[in-house]
Swiss-Prot record:
N-glycosylated; probably required for conformation. Removal of easily accessible sugars does not change its functional capacity, but removal of the core sugars with N-glycanase causes a virtually complete loss of enzyme activity, apparently as a result of major conformational changes in the molecule. Not O-glycosylated. It is found in: Secreted. Coiled coil: none annotated. This is Snaclec coagulation factor X-activating enzyme light chain 2. PROSITE patterns: C_TYPE_LECTIN_1, C_TYPE_LECTIN_2. Heterotrimer; disulfide-linked. The heterotrimer consists of 1 heavy chain (a metalloproteinase) and 2 light chains: LC1 and LC2. Binding to prothrombin and protein C (PROC) is hardly detectable.
Length: 158
């Protein structure tokens, strides 16, 4: 009876540790898996548009990262904190104001709507970054032609 309980408990631990992680899905090298998507930090300075185009040219058609929950925001913040140097302060994310006249028409570059937001102090600029000063947890808008590092979010290989 004791052996049965030990085996059952062991299987339960394995199941719980794999559930919700996208187990069985493969990410490219240097990428991290979180809830069925692969995230990769690129240490190349690009404009917002060039970074988005770069992500879309990935074999799985990715986009600049969209952040749709507090949990995902924490994951991305930890990913950036673990991969950055002391002088790296900004990363492009996939949020953009679509129409200069209507700030409320923001959406993610992957087409998803903004259901969670962590907007910091805003200026009238169209593209958004995560900033080191906020622990990479707040979104700030910047001129789209500035060059920053970026994070791509792509579907994994099945």
């Amino acid at each position: 009876m004791g052996r049965f309980i030990s085996v059952s408990f062991g299987l339960l631990v394995v199941f719980l540790s794999l559930s919700g992680t996208g187990a069985g899905l493969d990410c490219p090298p240097d990428s991290s898996l979180y809830r069925y998507f692969c995230y990769r930090v690129f240490k190349e300075h690009k404009t917002w548009e060039a970074a988005e185009r770069f992500c879309m040219e990935h074999p799985n058609n990715g986009h600049l990262v969209s952040i749709e929950s507090m949990e995902e925001a924490e994951f991305v913040a930890k990913l950036l904190s673990n991969t950055t140097g002391k002088f790296i302060t900004h990363f492009w994310i996939g949020l953009m104001i679509k129409d200069k006249e209507q700030e409320c028409s923001s959406e993610w570059s992957d087409g998803s709507s903004v259901s969670y937001d962590k907007l910091g102090k805003q200026e009238f600029r169209k593209c958004f970054v995560l900033e080191k000063e906020s622990g990479y947890r707040m979104w700030f808008n910047r001129n789209c032609e500035e060059r920053y590092l970026f994070v791509c979010k792509v579907p994994p290989e099945c």
